[in-house]
Amino acid sequence: MARSFKKIPFVSNKLLKKVKLFNRKKVILTWSRASTIVPVMIGNVIAVYNGNKHIPIFVTDGMIGHKFGEFSATRTFKSHKS
């Protein structure tokens, strides 16, 4: 068994408290892009800061186990000139 299976997922304590307190009533602001999405967060809208503004993310069951940073891009892509 790999070491990563033994490690528990990182979730900000402040974020977990907000999720339990608001319970799908408000958009939750967070700066913690490294936090892992856990089943308690399903159905909530969490706005993740990308360095410029907060990007709202509606958490679904397919997102469990991923990090919030995966869903808020920090760089804008300008297409290559043809």
From Swiss-Prot:
Localization annotation:
Plastid, Chloroplast
Chief place of localization: plastid
Q: What are the UniProt keywords, alphabetically?
A: Chloroplast, Plastid, Ribonucleoprotein, Ribosomal protein, RNA-binding, rRNA-binding
* Gene Ontology biological-process annotations: ribosomal small subunit assembly; translation
Asked if the keyword Ribonucleoprotein belongs to this entry, the reply reads yes
Q: Quote one Gene Ontology molecular function term.
A: rRNA binding
Question: Among the entry's GO cellular component annotations, what is one?
Answer: small ribosomal subunit
Question: Quick check: keyword DNA-binding in the entry?
Answer: no
The similarity annotation says: Belongs to the universal ribosomal protein uS19 family.
Against PANTHER family, the record matches this protein to: RIBOSOMAL PROTEIN S19P FAMILY MEMBER (PTHR11880), SMALL RIBOSOMAL SUBUNIT PROTEIN US19M (PTHR11880:SF8)
Q: What the protein does?
A: Protein S19 forms a complex with S13 that binds strongly to the 16S ribosomal RNA.
Name of the molecule in the record: Small ribosomal subunit protein uS19c
**What gene does this protein come from?**
rps19
